[in-house]
C-alpha cells in the first residue's frame, strides 16, 4: 500500500503526518508540485513480459503523459533481489540530488521509496504497484530501492541521455531511515 510520511527536516525519526489514503497523499504532494496517481492495466501482464508488453498494458496513460509533457524516451526497468549490481545501483540514487527534467516513474510491480526535500520538510513517499509519481525538475530528492530491490517501472525522459543527477553534497539523505519494504524484518 502506498504511504506518505512528512517530517521536519531536523527530525528524521518523527513524522508529523502519516497517511496511506490515496486522496490525502495526492493532496499533500500536490502542494509541493508533485503528481501522484494510480493507473490500472488495460490487459493482463504475465511474469516475464517484455518491455513492449508492459507498455502496451498502459498505452493510454503513457500516450497521455507523452502528449502532455513532451517526453522523448520511455523505457521499462526491472530490478530483482538477485541482481549482481543491486548495491551499486542502490548507492547511485541514495544521495540528495535534482534533475533538469521531471523525474516520472510508474511502478508496474514491486516498490521503492522516493524522498523529497522541500523547504524545511522531508516527504517520504512509498510507491507500490500501480503508483505514478512525477517529481518536477529542480526538486531535491533521493530514491531508495531497498537492500533487496524488487520493482518493474516505466520511466519517462525528456532528455535523450536519460537519468542525469546533479548532487547537492549534503548529508540529509544519510540522516533519514533507509527503505525497508513491508514484510522485511531488518535494514541492510
UniProtKB/Swiss-Prot annotation:
Cofactor annotation comment: Binds 1 Fe(2+) cation per monomer. Binds 1 nickel ion per monomer.
Residues holding Ni(2+): 97, 99, 103, 141
Pfam families: ARD
Reaction(s) this enzyme catalyzes, per UniProt: 1,2-dihydroxy-5-(methylsulfanyl)pent-1-en-3-one + O2 = 3-(methylsulfanyl)propanoate + CO + formate + 2 H(+); 1,2-dihydroxy-5-(methylsulfanyl)pent-1-en-3-one + O2 = 4-methylsulfanyl-2-oxobutanoate + formate + 2 H(+)
Site (Important to generate the dianion) residue list: 105
BP-aspect Gene Ontology terms: L-methionine salvage from methylthioadenosine; L-methionine salvage from S-adenosylmethionine
Transmembrane segments: none
Keywords noted in UniProt: Amino-acid biosynthesis, Dioxygenase, Iron, Metal-binding, Methionine biosynthesis, Nickel, Oxidoreductase
Cofactor requirement: Fe(2+); Ni(2+)
Primary enzyme class: oxidoreductase
Record's function text: Catalyzes 2 different reactions between oxygen and the acireductone 1,2-dihydroxy-3-keto-5-methylthiopentene (DHK-MTPene) depending upon the metal bound in the active site. Fe-containing acireductone dioxygenase (Fe-ARD) produces formate and 2-keto-4-methylthiobutyrate (KMTB), the alpha-ketoacid precursor of methionine in the methionine recycle pathway. Ni-containing acireductone dioxygenase (Ni-ARD) produces methylthiopropionate, carbon monoxide and formate, and does not lie on the methionine recycle pathway.
UniProt protein name: Acireductone dioxygenase
Source organism: Xylella fastidiosa (strain Temecula1 / ATCC 700964)
